[in-house]
């Protein structure tokens, strides 16, 4: 501990679990020293809103799956992905593990701004570290029981896609390995992947559950071969589908398409399934907003829920028809705030009021976007919290994880900027009276 760091709950965090407490060469460690309090009713609302939005998003995903391919292409979905977006998966849901992100408006109401449906991180913070902080301060943890809930969720997945099946002809139980994979030189990805893997191992202690780096991953005509000559029955991949689909072998062969062909043939299950890319696409929020505005597809209650929680979202082609005001422009495949701009629209002209610059931009892996979408700009309240270097002001990004269609752990990040990026801190949440 250096002279600028005082003793806090951060010292109680297990560095073998939360391996990125100190990240890169940032002056401050990643967690804040202080916690943020909301009443239980606030967390209940976050979870209820997330569950309702999840049902609506799944309903809208069916619209996109049943639409002509030209519509998907207009939303900048990769052409190579189109054959794989209508394959039924084990749980008949477009995403199994997802995370809704919210901001607060000036009245303190939650407004949903994004969903990470493909490769959500922030798992270690929400399902582990938040509880350590709450216990340290003697406060109620809004995520009490969430770790067990996540373990049971993973156990259910294992039972469905990787439980041993007897080979009656041989009288054996052939291995059905469930493989967890990421690029293991990125600490956050590795820690989140291993956290999920270890919870599945707890829930299915007799299962064949193992880690394999994406750097070591191979495929052949039968699927994903492993070092003991077995084949993966299922794969958890912390690697964006929109990037995977474009990857090629050293010989120039379409590795992503070859990989998904094997999935389509039933060689292995995928978590999350390929159709998670539909919800991950940022213009999907514009589709949901447009369907709700038409009042012809969703029920009246669903339309009301979209109006209440989803920040008004628009396709790029509709921007010229919008009224004057401030909007946020987001690239379809942007991540970590990359290339996000605040634009001021007046009559038929618009100017850039602010452009997000993120730290370590070269390390943020994302697909180049050919299109963008817009959202209403939400002015946010500012709060004060303490970090290693002192007291700072900032805004909150609030998250709620979904395990299938069930809301689970909540979490918060704290950023000096209204548009959070890689500079954001982990801020533990506690429950007030």
Task: Give the location of each predicted region.
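Preference for protein termini
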Residues: 1-433
């Amino acid at each position: 501990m250096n002279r600028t760091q005082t003793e806090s709950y951060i010292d109680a965090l297990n560095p073998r679990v939360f391996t990125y407490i100190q990240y890169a060469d940032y002056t401050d460690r990643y967690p804040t020293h202080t916690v943020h309090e909301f009443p239980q009713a606030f967390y209940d609302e976050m979870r209820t809103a997330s569950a309702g939005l999840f049902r609506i998003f799944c309903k809208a995903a069916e619209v996109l799956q049943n639409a002509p391919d030209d519509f998907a292409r207009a939303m900048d979905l990769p052409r190579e992905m189109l054959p794989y977006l209508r394959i039924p998966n084990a749980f008949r849901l477009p995403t199994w593990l997802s995370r809704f992100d919210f901001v607060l408006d000036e009245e303190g109401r939650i407004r949903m701004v994004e969903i990470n449906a493909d490769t959500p991180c922030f798992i270690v913070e929400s399902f582990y570290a938040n509880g350590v902080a709450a216990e340290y301060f003697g406060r109620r943890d809004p995520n009490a029981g969430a770790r067990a809930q996540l373990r049971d969720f993973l156990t259910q997945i294992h039972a469905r896609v990787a439980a041993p099946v007897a080979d009656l002809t041989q009288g054996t139980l052939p291995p059905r390995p469930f493989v967890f994979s990421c690029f293991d030189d990125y600490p956050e990805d590795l820690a989140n992947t291993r956290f999920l893997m270890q919870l599945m191992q707890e829930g299915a202690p007799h299962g064949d559950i193992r880690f394999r780096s994406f750097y070591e991953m191979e495929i052949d005509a039968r699927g994903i071969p492993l070092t003991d000559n077995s084949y993966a029955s299922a794969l958890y991949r912390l690697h964006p589908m929109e990037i995977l689909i474009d990857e090629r072998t050293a010989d120039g062969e379409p590795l992503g398409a070859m990989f998904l062909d094997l999935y389509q043939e039933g060689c292995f299950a995928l978590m999350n399934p390929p159709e998670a890319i539909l919800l991950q696409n940022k213009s999907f929020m514009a589709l949901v907003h447009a369907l709700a505005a038409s009042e012809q597809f969703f029920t009246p209650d669903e339309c009301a829920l979209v109006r209440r929680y989803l920040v008004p979202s628009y396709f790029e082609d509709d921007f010229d028809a919008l009224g004057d005001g401030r909007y946020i422009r987001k690239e379809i495949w942007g991540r970590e705030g990359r290339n996000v701009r605040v634009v001021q629209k007046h009559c038929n002209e618009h100017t850039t009021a602010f452009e997000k610059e993120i730290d370590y931009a070269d390390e943020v892996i994302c697909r180049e976007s050919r299109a963008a979408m817009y959202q209403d700009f939400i002015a946010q309240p500012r709060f004060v919290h303490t970090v290693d270097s002192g007291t700072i002001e900032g805004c909150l990004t609030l998250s709620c994880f979904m395990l299938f269609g069930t809301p689970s752990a909540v979490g918060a990040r704290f950023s000096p900027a209204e548009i959070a990026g890689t500079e954001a801190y982990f801020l533990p949440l506690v429950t007030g009276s």
